[in-house]
């Protein structure tokens, strides 16, 4: 032992590097900032560094949006069926099972009724993680169930779209949902009940070509991709470079395709004020309540 080792205090080796539990941190998909997940969830999955609106599940979106305590889910009796016995690289029934397992949902639309700042409403939200939020028979059935509740109880309807379009595995059945949902919304118009469409990233295909663009007010979240065919498909077809930001909500607002852009963190307050004006309701939450 050297003289230096004799005069220095003995040290012990660390038992090992402490592992950080999984799920504590998240990475912004826009600016790559590392974010504390609990704080990100409080901000409704909007990055506090760059304000990028990350995708969230349809169920979580409705839980953020509707008042706590009296939310009732609609259309739970509807479940997908492989009527056509469709098969591509795998069976449609197997795709349904896999999507249900990965998303935790039975199909691509969650529908609820409840209150928004005391105003009785029905709200639906697409679940993009379920086969790209594709519109199929169950989506149409649940959407119509929500409309029927609005017609019965004189309530407005809010829809949060996040979809790649019609579900090819249901062929013509999925395309018929475009007409089915549009016809249901026509009944809302006849009765003078507001329908607000909120288009989130992405809202494409048959959904954008039907119910998503039929709102009395059409809203986009910041930088949401909204259109029919995607920009790459269009560029390959027309053989031209598209303008910067083409099909983003800011581009659509500038060209009059949507009415407004609302930050997700301000969605509840803004839509509650709009609905109060639409329905000639008092401004206080208590006065909106139905006896």
From Swiss-Prot:
This protein's record includes keyword Ion transport: no
UniProt remark on cofactor binding: Binds 1 zinc ion per subunit.
Gene3D superfamilies in the record: 2-enoyl-CoA Hydratase, Chain A, domain 1 (3.90.226.10)
GO molecular function (one): carboxyl- or carbamoyltransferase activity
Compartments where located: Cytoplasm
InterPro entries xref list: AcCoA_carboxyl_beta, Acetyl_CoA_COase_Trfase_b_su, ClpP/crotonase-like_dom_sf, COA_CT_N, Znf-ACC
Keywords: ATP-binding, Cytoplasm, Fatty acid biosynthesis, Fatty acid metabolism, Lipid biosynthesis, Lipid metabolism, Metal-binding, Nucleotide-binding, Transferase, Zinc, Zinc-finger
Gene Ontology terms: cellular component: acetate CoA-transferase complex
Biological pathway: Lipid metabolism; malonyl-CoA biosynthesis; malonyl-CoA from acetyl-CoA: step 1/1
Superkingdom of origin organism: Bacteria
Catalytic EC class: transferase
Entry binding sites for Zn(2+): 28, 31, 47, 50
A Pfam match: Carboxyl_trans
Cofactor: Zn(2+)
Zinc finger intervals, C4-type: 28-50
EC number(s) per entry: 2.1.3.15
Main location: cytoplasm
SUPFAM superfamilies: ClpP/crotonase
A GO biological process held by the record: fatty acid biosynthetic process
Subunit structure and binding partners: Acetyl-CoA carboxylase is a heterohexamer composed of biotin carboxyl carrier protein (AccB), biotin carboxylase (AccC) and two subunits each of ACCase subunit alpha (AccA) and ACCase subunit beta (AccD).
Protein's job: Component of the acetyl coenzyme A carboxylase (ACC) complex. Biotin carboxylase (BC) catalyzes the carboxylation of biotin on its carrier protein (BCCP) and then the CO(2) group is transferred by the transcarboxylase to acetyl-CoA to form malonyl-CoA.
Record family assignment: Belongs to the AccD/PCCB family.
Protein name according to UniProt: Acetyl-coenzyme A carboxylase carboxyl transferase subunit beta
Species: Pseudoalteromonas translucida (strain TAC 125)
Protein's gene: accD
